[in-house]
Amino acid sequence: MLALIKEEGYGKAWLAADAPFVIDNNYLGGTWTFGVNWSGSSKAYGLTQAIEFDKDEASQRLQDWLDTLPINRPALLPISNDIVLTPQPGQNALFFSVTNDSSIVTKSTQTTEFDLAYSFPAWSGDTGNLYLGAEARLYFMRLSRLSVRFGDVTDSEELFDAIRHSEFRNDEGVGVDVGALWVSDNYQLGAQITNINEPGFVFPDVNLEPYKSEGAINFLLADQRYTMDRQLKLEGSIFTSDRRWSAHVGYDADSATDPMGDQFQWLTVSGGFTTDSWWLPSGRIGYRQNLAGTKLSYVGIGVTAFKFVNLDIASALDTVRIDGTTLPQGVMFSLGFQIAW
């Protein structure tokens, strides 16, 4: 991740585990689903400000320093309001530092989620069936945040220690989703609105005392609060008459923001097949693109093995060079198990 930050100016990691349980009964006339999910994410990026630099002024200050007797030369040489040089004649070296409010910002979250969903058949006819449902999600979040000005970094190891030992703040919230699904013989259409109530969570404070820029201060204050944006999700699927082949499309009608502050709005297209094989009962291929934020596109492939193991992997089409090696900008990997009892 640090190598990615070096090349791209930011780095991000995400990990999740999910355990859904479907209770197949007709209590209150529908189906109940209970799930537990854990996810963690972290990101480091630069908060940059333009450096004020006048070449003629810097040249004059440097010349004045050279014209001063060595014994009277100051240890620090500011060549602009934002740049300070530290000459080390004994080591034949010159150190450079930026003194404006450009910073490195790190954020991380750990989320435990409990969800309870209920769906029921609202209408049935010759052309298909309409299902309605709702879901409540209880979130327990641990949030951490650190911001350090580049000019205040004197020891990179101390900085990484501070990042690793950042304090977490605990926060809780409840989200509500509603949805509708129309199912026919050869197709289905669905719509879901997530986080209708838009629950909010608060990151810890960061030390604003060293900051002078109003823009940097306002950004860090606004960045303290994370809101789960309301989002409309649409989906559609078509099937062959024997349901061995299928195609699926999913579309987020608007963008939303994740805890790291990145926007996402996914468009997904996939196709799948099923067989009578016990070893490999189904397979799938897919394409997904983030229409907001990073604008990254992914291609993926997945299989179901032994009728209960789901394995999927996806890779971004865009690449980045790290230490001379070309790598995809993003990789997704998923391993799941489905068991009925």
Regions from the PLM with identified roles:
Residues 25-32, 121-132, 182-191, 240-245, ...:
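Secondary-structure transition into beta-strands, especially the periplasmic turns and strand N-termini
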Residues 6-7, 163-164, 173, 219-221, ...:
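Short secondary-structure boundary micro-motifs
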Residues 188-193, 199-341:
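Outer membrane beta-barrel transmembrane domains
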Residues 1-166, 210-215, 269, 311-313, ...:
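A subset of solvent-exposed loop/turn segments in beta-rich extracellular surface proteins, enriched
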Residues 103-123, 130-136, 140, 172-183, ...:
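Extended, compositionally biased low-complexity polar/Lys-Gly-rich tracts
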Residues 139-209:
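Loop-centered beta-sheet repeat module
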